[in-house]
A protein has these predicted regions:
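Alpha/beta-hydrolase-fold enzymes
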Residues: 122-205
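Serine-hydrolase catalytic core
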Residues: 177-242
Length: 242
């Protein structure tokens, strides 16, 4: 059974999330949190969540701020004015506490892809005692040419403002990924299924670009998630699959 709920983010917007609960089961195997990647939203994981739900898991899929319907001032690809990492971590922990109040004595796991995997890395360093394991897919090892990219973003911020959408950068990044798989379209890197590629291309909740501030936050999150400090703070007993 699927239902949608919201909570108030520390970034002062409403975060939407879906809960998938087995209808007929004696005991829930675990609660599984899904953290989506860039240019995604909670609805993209409906098929996977239903599959896991049928296997006896409770699945929680949440929009990240700036994605889906969890927007600040209706702005896609924008996380907020402040240094957002601490706020995003508090949001993740708040959602876990909501579920822990409902499912006590139940294992908790996280699964994430891309930026979602980086978020889980960071979360594990801060709240690793609160869950049993994590599965990280497509977690990049860092940010290449970070200083140069940050310099370019500061230039755009000065000239256009922090909410300016970098459409050309988004298109270039997607085409670069697609060319690795001999794809001809921006979303060809996702799958060779043309119907799914067209769906992503025509969906305004996935086919959007990030703001200058959004890209800056993404780079900072990825860099910090791969820092020595984060690795040292992550519990060694936490089950991790990469």
């Amino acid at each position: 059974m699927k239902h949608e709920e919201t909570y108030t983010s520390t970034l002062h917007t409403h975060v939407h999330f879906f809960i998938y609960e087995p209808q007929v089961i004696i005991r829930v195997k675990a609660v599984l949190f899904v953290q989506h990647d860039l240019n995604e939203n909670a609805s993209n994981y409906d098929h996977f969540a239903n599959f896991m739900c049928d296997k006896g898991y409770v699945v929680v899929v949440s929009d990240m701020v700036g994605h889906g319907h969890s927007l600040i001032d209706f702005e896609q690809g924008y996380f907020g004015k402040t240094d957002v990492l601490d706020h995003l971590m508090k949001d993740m922990h708040h959602l876990q506490k909501v579920m822990m109040a409902r499912y006590t004595d139940t294992p908790y796991y996280y699964i994430g892809t891309g930026l979602g995997a980086q978020m889980i890395r960071e979360y594990a360093a801060r709240f690793g005692d609160y869950f049993q394991g994590m599965l990280l897919m497509g977690a990049v090892s860092g940010v290449r040419a970070y200083r140069y990219k940050n310099l370019c973003l500061n230039f755009f911020k000065l000239m256009k403002g922090e909410r300016y959408h970098l459409n050309k950068l988004a298109l270039r990044n997607r085409m670069k990924l697609s060319h690795h798989f001999n794809g001809d379209y921006p979303f060809s890197y996702l799958t060779d299924n043309e119907q799914l590629v067209n769906r992503f291309s025509n969906d305004t909740l996935t086919n959007f670009s990030y703001t200058v501030k959004g890209y800056s936050d993404i780079y900072k999150i990825s860099r910090h998630a791969n820092s020595e400090e984060t690795y040292q703070k992550t519990p060694t007993y936490l089950s991790t699959w990469i």
